[in-house]
Swiss-Prot record:
Family as reported in the entry's similarity comment: Belongs to the polyribonucleotide nucleotidyltransferase family.
Descriptive protein name: Polyribonucleotide nucleotidyltransferase
Organism: Chlorobium phaeobacteroides (strain BS1)
Purpose of the protein: Involved in mRNA degradation. Catalyzes the phosphorolysis of single-stranded polyribonucleotides processively in the 3'- to 5'-direction.
Keyword check for Mitochondrion: no
Cofactor dependency: Mg(2+)
Domain S1 motif: 639-713
UniProt-annotated binding residues for Mg(2+): D503, D509
Domain KH, residue spans: 570-629
Length: 734
């Protein structure tokens, strides 16, 4: 059955959803279109029952942008799409985080969602369309799913909110936030903004939610027409008798443990001991009661002897105990109050050869952030469907297994690391100076050395501090905090600066970063259905208090960026030259620019608009290169002294010397030395570098060419201080 429906979101933004034409062997498939951007999403969920020991939902979301969608060839030697780009990974995470909470508890079938961008108008980003398509594909399938989910992007231009702004509109927008939600609630947020207030954030979310409701209704209509019954599944759960036995055995020791304000490692050891003791106790009891014949007669009896089932219910009791402690007693695992931030310590300049560094420690979460400054040549080339750009500010996040006291694979960057690094990067980039103010390429690397919650927000704080330590003139410092939520019916508690356990056992992870004047980035994941706006409002207000507290601690360490960049950072200078002089600076085959680099030790980059950036290890090298370039592009003037190169010898006439690229002059035989010169080659050889003075400029009457008369003798007649004065020194630097 082919179905196509559309909805107009205003401003000519029409979204079309269709199903029944393509990929019909998948459990569900849809195509979503806006403008000329189209995505196809498919979903397949295994019908093989999961293992009785499985306690997680193995869902995989793949988002791929096909280069043919924009009529482009993939870059590089191999002309086909290969591993996912950072943009594709971030888009996949965006969709995964919005969909995952909507699958029913206990549904553990292997599920794969593949979203492919098959057409791109290079105006509309396809990531939010991919979220809509994925949800719609599940809705028209027989896979159990709570309700439809839609994603939109919200921008704001001149104070007016815009749904799904184009790339051109986003360039003018002070908000770029992706929102995922259902008819009733918001389940995912991620975005960046130019220091907006908490009230403005809520307003943007409400605006986006209205559009989400319309798109969800469209999905519901399509699903109703398809009318495919949802498959049944058996959620593996402990029998009631077993649950009661486990609760009786473990509730008291877990409650006693919860009220102990312990460090992470000690709590983990004691918790493991409780799990082991209770599991052995339960197994010992039922091994004596249940025989092989009992299991043959009633296979569910095997669950009483399943360590995974027992451990899973102990975990459920642990979660319940912690949540009640917070809701009933306003007490947290480490003894803090609900709004209290963990102790903070900061050290700057720890890495002697780095261009800037900071060690930011908050409780048991620690980030070492290191700054590297480079030239424009160090910028990251970005090749996507939408555009080809250069990225001059990067923040990379590394999460080694030792940071949580574990062993693990060390190698390529994982999706989580890419996602956390991107969030921290978006938070800080709003205060990074423009290229005209600070022409460096900036790379910050956050090494997570310890982790017990909110390592991405520790990276935001550490990155700000490392940049300021390295003399990067950030407009304002940025801090970040992770908020949590515990909610049971109408009773709830919002937690500031959550621990790893509070994130794992809680209902929300809401990261907010910003300056004193407003929010610069946020990310929210919800594990429950039904987040009320008044809870969101409280979380935002509480996050502001925590953010300002952390900023106070940061400014105690360093209030303003250092006045100079790090000792070992390259020194950059820029000059502007006429566009028609670019060729003169570069020279034939790059000969001139290479020569300047060899002689001065400076690296030179020339942009198409005539901006010349000089990078050098010291100021003297840069100054020499600048003076050389200025001389190269200047017009020859009588009296100017040049360091030239002998190009040709005429024994009875003199020597032709190149004083500027493609500009030669004649040193007449009479201007070579004070004494009489009989043979030019006795004094000069081809290729010699000699200092000459321009003594005359005239136009040849017959050819019309400009002739330059040069003299070596004129410099010999000059006093030493004149011959080595500013103009002569200028040429020595060439």
């Amino acid at each position: 059955m082919f179905i196509r429906k559309e909805i107009d979101l205003g401003d000519g933004k029409v979204i079309t959803i269709e199903t029944g034409k393509m990929a019909k062997q998948a459990d569900g498939a849809t195509i979503v279109r806006m403008g000329d951007t189209m995505v196809i999403a498919t979903v397949v969920s295994s019908r093989t029952p999961p293992s009785p020991n499985q306690d997680f939902f193995p869902m995989q979301v793949e988002y791929r942008e096909k280069y043919y969608a924009a009529g482009k060839f993939p870059g590089g030697f191999i002309k086909r799409e290969s591993r996912p780009s950072e943009k594709e990974i971030l888009s996949a995470r965006l969709i995964d985080r919005a969909l995952r909470p909507l699958f029913p508890n206990g549904y553990y079938q292997d599920t794969q969602i593949i979203i492919s961008v098959i057409s791109s108008d290079q105006l509309n980003d396809a990531d939010v369309l991919g979220g809509i398509a994925a949800s719609a594909a599940i809705m028209v399938s027989d896979i159990p799913f709570a309700n439809s989910m839609s994603e939109v992007r919200v921008g704001r231009i001149n104070g007016e909110f815009v749904i799904n702004p184009t790339i051109n509109e986003l360039a003018q927008s002070d908000i770029d936030i992706s929102i995922g939600g259902t008819n009733d609630t918001i389940c995912m947020l991620e975005g960046e903004m130019n220091e907006i207030s908490e009230a403005e954030m809520l307003e943007a979310i409400r605006f986006g939610h209205e559009a989400i409701k319309k798109i969800c209704s469209l999905q519901d209509d399509i699903a109703a027409e398809v009318n495919k019954p949802k498959r049944s599944f058996l959620a593996i759960d402990a029998p009631d008798e077993l649950k009661e036995s486990i609760k009786e055995a473990c509730e008291a020791p877990l409650k006693e443990l919860a009220y102990m304000p312990l460090a992470k490692e000690e709590r983990a050891e004691k918790t493991t001991a409780v799990y082991k003791s209770i599991t052995e106790q339960i197994l010992g009891r039922y091994k004596n009661e249940i025989t092989a014949e009992d299991i043959a007669a009633d296979p569910s009896k095997a669950l009483y002897l399943n360590e995974q089932i027992i451990s899973g219910h102990i975990h459920a009791i642990e979660k319940q105990v912690m949540r009640h402690m917070i809701l009933d007693d306003a007490k947290r695992l480490d003894g803090r109050k609900l709004e209290e931030v963990r102790p903070i310590s900061i050290e700057l300049g720890l890495i002697p050869r780095a261009h800037g560094s900071a060690l930011f420690t908050r409780g048991e979460t620690q980030a070492l952030v290191v700054l590297t400054l480079g030239t424009k040549k160090d910028a990251q080339m970005i090749d996507t469907l939408l555009d080809d750009t250069e990225k001059r500010f990067m923040l990379h996040y590394n999460f080694p297994p030792f940071s949580v006291g574990e062993t693990g694979r060390v190698g390529g960057v994982g999706r989580r690391e890419i996602g956390h690094g991107n969030l921290a990067e978006r938070a800080v980039k709003k205060v990074v100076p423009s290229e005209s103010e600070f022409p460096y390429t900036i790379r910050l690397v956050s090494e997570i050395l310890e982790s017990n919650g909110s390592s991405s927000m520790a990276s935001v704080c550490g990155a700000t501090l490392a940049a300021m330590d390295g003399g990067v003139p950030l407009t304002k410092p940025v801090s970040g905090i992770a908020m949590g939520l515990i909610k049971e019916d109408d009773n709830y508690a919002v937690l500031s600066d959550i621990l790893g356990n509070e994130d794992h056992l809680g209902d929300m992870d809401f990261k907010v970063a910003g300056t004193r004047d407003g929010i610069t980035a946020c990310q929210m994941d919800i594990k429950i259905d039904g987040l009320d706006y008044h809870i969101l409002e409280k979380a935002l207000e509480q996050s502001k208090n925590g953010r300002l507290h952390i900023l106070d601690k940061m400014t105690e360490s360093i209030a303003d960026p250092r006045g100079e960049i790090g000792q070992y950072a390259p020194k950059l200078s820029t000059i502007q030259v006429p566009v028609d002089a670019i060729g003169m600076i570069i020279g034939k085959g790059g000969e001139t620019i290479r020569s300047i680099t060899e002689e001065t030790g400076a690296q030179i980059n020339v942009d198409d608009d005539g901006t010349v950036t000089i990078s050098s290890p010291n100021g003297e090298s840069a100054a020499a290169a600048i003076e050389t370039i200025k001389t190269l592009i200047s017009k020859p003037e009588v009296g100017t002294i040049y360091m030239g190169k002998v190009k040709d010898i005429r024994e009875d006439l003199g020597a032709f010397v190149e004083i500027l690229p493609r500009t030669d002059g004649l040193v007449h035989i009479s201007e070579i030395a004070r004494e009489r010169v009989n043979k030019v080659s006795d004094h000069l050889k081809q290729g010699d570098r000699v200092k000459v003075k321009l003594i005359d400029i005239r136009k040849d009457q017959r050819s019309g060419k400009i002739r330059y008369a040069l003299s070596i003798k004129a410099l010999l007649d000059m006093p030493a201080e004149s011959a080595n004065g500013p103009s002569a020194q200028e040429e020595q630097n060439q």
